[in-house]
UniProtKB/Swiss-Prot annotation:
The gene is Itfg1. One of its GO terms (cellular component) is extracellular region. It is a single-pass type I membrane protein. This is T-cell immunomodulatory protein. It comes from Rattus norvegicus. Residues 1-32 form the signal peptide. The chain crosses the membrane at residues 564-584. The keyword Transmembrane helix applies. Interacts with RUVBL1, RUVBL2 and alpha-tubulin. Keywords: Cell membrane, Glycoprotein, Membrane, Repeat, Secreted, Signal, Transmembrane, Transmembrane helix. FG-GAP repeats lie at residues 98-135, 153-183, 256-291. It is found in: Secreted; Cell membrane. It comes from the Eukaryota.
Length: 610
């Protein structure tokens, strides 16, 4: 190349390297939330969101919304705006009832989603709940095809898989006995569940989740001791039978006790027990305690709830004999907002010196004080999250993957739409960072390729499966994560029928992903299967068929390109075009230089000849 071209080439190459440097830096993480309520619901954004599930088996999650005390409206996900449309309706108006809970599930084992409703009858003099099941047919609900259960409940039931047949069962205290009873799905027959001297707490926060690290869901109960002290019991699933393993009390400092929640808080692959509450009866001083798996010791992970001189606290549960609206206990809703592999939470806090209550994001961050040193992590309240702090009089806040892209967005319910109904707000999570995820849903496995009408039952909402992964993080260290599927069902638990597990900034394949399901009485071997080399940013649908032969289970993998991947593809295409342009320019300049040199050589030849 001619020497005269070097400066221009250096300039072009400098521009190229500058572009590549800017590409490698990428956009700064966005923290704001974008309100997309009108885009999702149009003018229908009201009612109490009570449950999630895929009613019509189209692999998109639908919303179950209660309106006007006794109507259930199912908003089906659609491809065009508004993206959730009210398509299915069933009503208990003839019962003059207040519906208190909605639990979708396949209660007869036909691979169609049914819906269990609990309700207060109009004359609820004994304060007990009635229950009715609307049966699914042709991927919808038939308002006339229903079964009224012949027993009433002392509290909202826990939906679990008691006998390991992967048909949901109903666990509750009924009017027939002070001992827990189980309504087995399929034949709808009642049986004694457990024999215990403990009295069940109301409102309870029972759970069906693996707490003994064997991939088999155990039974967690919230009870009262003989001295009326709050306590917790773990009934271990041993060979398909439940036997009591441990009993422990609440933290001594807590006066008001909220609903237990479960998450792999410290990212070690095992479930931890989170307990929100207050250290005084007026909730002037709120806290969240954590019991790490297997330790038996409580440690505070949130104690400071003041912001700029204003003290915020949890909203204590008020027990009403004759409620006029759905009671909402003190609850945390768990989800990995920023996909860093450490689950965050949403909570409702009230200004202790005023009347306003708002939803706040509690971010899971490394511990920075002595009290949480043992668990290494803590919650930090995100006080100024744009979008969330604009919603006043919030009642409930939960996570939901609105656009099925693996990012957990936020839904908030707030008072004030009407006297008996609330407003729905949906906030898109604009968090953009170099983080990855895997989304896992475990189906019932009641059928595989021979499902009725050839429709795979994506939406049967299966309680009990347990998921764990192991991978290597960006620094080369081993990283674990775990979650239980639909472990709680009562008191607006609002758990998703899938799990989104954050992987942090590691784009490595998941080395191992394990899935375990409940097993029936008498079966000693654990039902667990392992998959290897799972691609990040993918959705895995596990079909555990047949149940007792894990090596025969199948998994369908769906890739979900994130915005980062798409932006990178666009930027890479731009860089390639830029490089081709540079090559063309340099080639053209090289050709010009060669032509000039040839002319000079020709002139020199003629001069020498003369």
């Amino acid at each position: 190349m001619a020497a005269g071209l070097l400066p221009s080439a250096r300039a072009v190459l400098a521009l190229l390297f500058l572009g590549l440097a800017l590409l490698s830096v990428g956009p700064a993480p966005a923290q704001a939330l974008h309100n997309v309520t009108a885009e999702l619901f149009g003018g229908e954004a009201w009612g109490t969101l009570a449950a999630f599930g895929d009613l019509n088996s189209d692999k998109q999650t639908d919303l179950f919304v209660l309106r006007e005390r006794n109507d259930l409206i199912v908003f089906l996900a659609d491809q065009s705006a508004p993206y959730f449309k009210p398509k299915v309706k069933v009503s208990l108006k003839n019962f003059s009832a207040l519906v208190t809970s909605v639990v979708p599930g396949d209660y007869d084992g036909d691979s169609q989603m049914d819906v269990l409703l609990t309700y207060f009858p109009q004359n609820h003099s004994n304060n007990e709940l009635g229950a009715v099941i609307f049966w699914g047919q042709n991927q919808t609900l038939d308002p006339k095809n229903m079964t009224i259960l012949n027993r009433t409940f002392h509290d909202q039931p826990l939906i679990m898989d008691f006998n390991g047949d992967l048909i949901p069962d109903v666990f509750a205290i009924t009017n027939e006995s002070s001992q827990p009873q189980i309504l087995l799905g399929g034949d709808l027959s009642w049986h004694p569940a457990l024999t215990t001297k403990s009295k069940m707490r109301d409102p309870h926060s029972r759970a069906f989740i693996d707490l003994t690290e064997d991939f088999t869901a155990d039974l967690f109960l919230t009870t009262l001791s003989a001295s009326n002290t709050f306590q917790f019991e773990i009934w271990e699933n041993l060979g398909g039978n439940f036997s009591i393993r441990s009993v422990f009390e609440k933290p001594k400092n807590l006066v008001v006790v909220g609903q237990s929640a479960f998450a792999d808080f410290d990212g070690d692959g095992h479930m931890d027990h989170l307990l929100p509450g207050c250290e005084d009866k007026d909730c002037q001083k709120s806290a969240i305690y954590l019991m790490r798996s297997g330790t038996g010791q409580w440690a505070p992970v949130l104690q400071d709830s003041s912001n700029k001189g204003t003290l915020w606290g949890f909203v204590p549960f008020v027990h009403e004999e004759r409620p006029t609206a759905i009671p909402v206990p003190l609850t945390l809703h768990i989800g990995d907002y920023n996909m860093d592999g450490y689950p965050d939470a949403l909570a409702i806090l009230k200004n202790t010196s005023g009347s306003n209550q708002q939803a706040f994001l509690l971010e899971n961050v490394p511990c920075n004080n002595a009290s949480c040193e043992e668990v290494h992590r803590m919650f930090k309240v995100y006080w100024d999250l744009a979008g969330l702090n604009l919603i006043k009089d919030a009642m409930v806040a939960t996570f939901f993957d609105i656009y099925e892209d693996g990012t957990l967005d936020i839904i908030v319910l707030s008072k004030g739409y009407t006297k008996s109904d609330v407003a729905i707000h949906t906030l898109k999570n604009n968090f953009e960072a170099d983080a990855y995820f895997v989304k896992v849903i475990v189906l019932s496995g009641l059928c595989s390729s021979d499902c009725p009408r050839k429709i795979t039952p994506f939406g049967v909402n299966q309680p009990g499966p347990y998921i764990m992964y192991t991978t290597v993080d960006a620094n080369g260290y081993l990283k674990n994560g775990s979650a239980g599927q639909l472990s709680q069902s009562a008191h607006l638990a609002l758990q998703l029928p899938y799990n989104v597990l954050g992987l942090g900034r590691s784009a490595n394949f998941l080395d191992h992903l394990f899935v375990g399901i409940p097993r029936p009485s008498g079966e000693k071997s654990i039902r667990k299967q392992e998959w290897t080399a799972i691609i990040p940013n993918s959705q895995l649908m596990v079909i555990p068929y047949p149940h007792s032969v894990p090596r025969s289970w199948s998994a369908k993998l769906y890739l979900t390109p994130s915005n980062i991947v798409l932006l990178t593809a666009v930027a890479l295409t731009g860089v390639c075009v830029f490089i081709l342009a540079i090559i063309a320019i340099l080639h053209w300049q090289e050709k010009k230089a060669d032509d000039r040199e040839k002319r000079q050589e020709a002139h020199r030849f003629h001069f020498d000849a003369m």
